[in-house]
Amino acid sequence: MPRQFPKLNISEVDEQVRLLAEKVFAKVLREEDSKDALSLFTVPEDCPIGQKEAKERELQKELAEQKSVETAKRKKSFKMIRSQSLSLQMPPQQDWKGPPAASPAMSPTTPVVTGATSLPTPAPYAMPEFQRVTISGDYCAGITLEDYEQAAKSLAKALMIREKYARLAYHRFPRITSQYLGHPRADTAPPEEGLPDFHPPPLPQEDPYCLDDAPPNLDYLVHMQGGILFVYDNKKMLEHQEPHSLPYPDLETYTVDMSHILALITDGPTKTYCHRRLNFLESKFSLHEMLNEMSEFKELKSNPHRDFYNVRKVDTHIHAAACMNQKHLLRFIKHTYQTEPDRTVAEKRGRKITLRQVFDGLHMDPYDLTVDSLDVHAGRQTFHRFDKFNSKYNPVGASELRDLYLKTENYLGGEYFARMVKEVARELEESKYQYSEPRLSIYGRSPEEWPNLAYWFIQHKVYSPNMRWIIQVPRIYDIFRSKKLLPNFGKMLENIFLPLFKATINPQDHRELHLFLKYVTGFDSVDDESKHSDHMFSDKSPNPDVWTSEQNPPYSYYLYYMYANIMVLNNLRRERGLSTFLFRPHCGEAGSITHLVSAFLTADNISHGLLLKKSPVLQYLYYLAQIPIAMSPLSNNSLFLEYSKNPLREFLHKGLHVSLSTDDPMQFHYTKEALMEEYAIAAQVWKLSTCDLCEIARNSVLQSGLSHQEKQKFLGQNYYKEGPEGNDIRKTNVAQIRMAFRYETLCNELSFLSDAMKSEEITALTN
């Protein structure tokens, strides 16, 4: 059956939900001050009057419930369901026999979903004994039954919306969450079905630059409508507007779904419920750590050959133009000046310029340069000044040196930049255990950017087994429009995505781009999130082909149209047996909380995510959906948030899927191994244990664009399975106790949602 995008109508949205969503957007647009704009979504930390009034309201609700016969019946039915859930989540304890022996009874329990015909078989994995924390009672949320059921059902609906968008774009969605939501294929589909398709690395005897394996051309036609590229089998189909059978997104449906999430994050009972659950998760981890820290440490000590230094780590968020540290850049500049000062490196007004003349024009001698005079490091002056931070990409404040050393398109064809990237790659290969995912820019000014970038990659032989590439699209349409480089926003989207569709449909005609795309694993959306936009994105927003103003579209507008085209492209590439792409935008570093709502629907994973701390509902949803978050505390420390206030440790303890990344080593780091610098500082400041560090490292590999074969090699054959069954301690150095705790805790939280849905069914049957 062909995959289709399920459409909804705006009239199907509850009027109250729609008005609330519009109120949220209007609030964000009206108030530039971030604290005021976030007031709708935050739970006040210190407001005695507000807390007292809230407690009074809760008490009145509790007293009213005690007198209600109907509520008593519902409580009784829910108590039965909850008792069953708790008994299933607590496997019996036995002596640990060690990793080689299988003991099914010791495995964390797989969920029993509504409508399941039989109990799922527990994972055949041995588990060491450890101390568990459980809470029993009528309902464990600490709020009234009515509020609990309302919150749980709303959260379940939000997760179902997320699952719909993830599956349509071949993004990842946790199988365990899908099981609890009652997805019909969750029990029958093979565990590896939901994995993204990344091209495996070439074998040692294979040429990574071979152009002869392109599949045959299909000669489909591609036409943009409303900012989205549609594929047609032939000219006749195009004339009749009958596109190829692929899922094409619908803006009205997206607006409906976004309205539900926006209304949810402002709902009082849901905010209270999520706030309590998040506090519980953090407290539960503290208790787990207190009770089982030594048991975890004993597990790691008995694990031969593996420690923190020789587990694989991936830098999941790093920009190629700043992937080297400042000393590396300085050394390279001096080396090129000493070895080839008379080489022609630029052309200005028809006059060729040598490297010596470039520095003479800047009135400087490279011999006298220091890391301080190079001035590429971010400091105190860049805090909350993204404009000053961007200027740090210009060595010595000279854009000429940036164009010469840090660009792929210049007189030398990006040779110097390629050489530096290859030096960084060589250091990664020597370290053996470190990988990175550098971002390369595509601006959308011209469709020639793609073939030029592919040529740069092949011409300078930039491939490295320790690197996977991500394409970042800066949100700077307003700059190009003001310079008359683009007629409308639709043209920018066409320049970004049309070459990819052509290379997918007719790879024989675009061999270089087809080859380059094998090593590209995702797309990123980048720029200063704190920029204010006066436009409220909705189904009434102008189409990209009529967005001709010099005003930049809002963040949500960018994300929807990038996701829409990536979704269609992924389905086309999957049909052809080619690799697919993940959407991994910068999100939640600054700006509006609505950015995180857009990413919840459209992104596979995000970078930064700091603003999740401001919204308990979104933070809890990101936890339940296990959305990967690449965090860069040293980068944030120089730009938006002091290191001590960074929520990474808090997110890790609660169980969010976080990894450590460097962002821009040139601006923020001092050592040659920037990623190890991140881990070392985090470990010292937050007193992270070895198990914590290895868990973060394992998360980074899971989040990354490394292929299925590589992840099996680095994490274990069953890495895609959830819980201890998917963990091979011999490769990850993550204690099975920790994996069991994470899995059982997630199952427990998800069971609250499924129990609420079951209680509704039982109540309906008894009435």
From Swiss-Prot:
Its EC number is 3.5.4.6. The keyword Transmembrane does not apply. It comes from the Eukaryota. GO terms for molecular function: AMP deaminase activity; metal ion binding. The keyword Phosphoprotein applies. InterPro entries: A/AMP_deam_AS (IPR006650), AMPD (IPR006329), Metal_Hydrolase (IPR032466). Substrate binds at H319, K388, F389, N390, S391, K392, Y393, E589, D664, P665, M666, Q667. Belongs to the metallo-dependent hydrolases superfamily. Adenosine and AMP deaminases family. This is AMP deaminase 3. It comes from Homo sapiens. The gene is AMPD3.
